[in-house]
A protein has these predicted regions:
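Catalytic cores of peptidoglycan-degrading enzymes
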Residues: 1-104
Length: 104
């Protein structure tokens, strides 16, 4: 869970490949393709602040935490993928960065 309207930041430089609410259950969502072949996903957004084709930089605000899709509290669903395979994002963070983890 996260406070409604909190800024959502791009995890790394990349190009927005999807920014919409057309996938059932996910609400408003952004997908970013990165040069290393990874894709990051940010779902349940209240607002989308980037468009398909936009070049985004690490730390750039791309959206706001929301309560869209199949959720009952404001939250951000973050995913890191390589192709169709979901990866554990904690294994790909830059050493020394802090991370707040929430689980169900």
């Amino acid at each position: 869970a996260a406070p409604l309207g909190s800024p959502v930041l791009a995890a790394e430089n990349g190009v927005v490949s999807y920014a919409s609410d057309e996938i059932a259950g996910w609400g408003r969502m952004i997908l970013i393709r990165h040069a290393d072949g990874f894709t990051t996903g940010y779902a349940h957004l209240d607002s989308i602040l980037a468009a398909v084709g936009d070049q985004v930089t690490r730390g750039q605000v791309i959206g706001r935490v929301g309560q869209t899709g199949y959720v009952d509290t404001p939250q951000l669903h973050f995913e890191l993928r390589s192709g169709r395979r979901a990866l554990d994002p904690s294994r790909h963070l830059v050493k020394g960065e802090e991370m707040e983890v929430a689980s169900r």
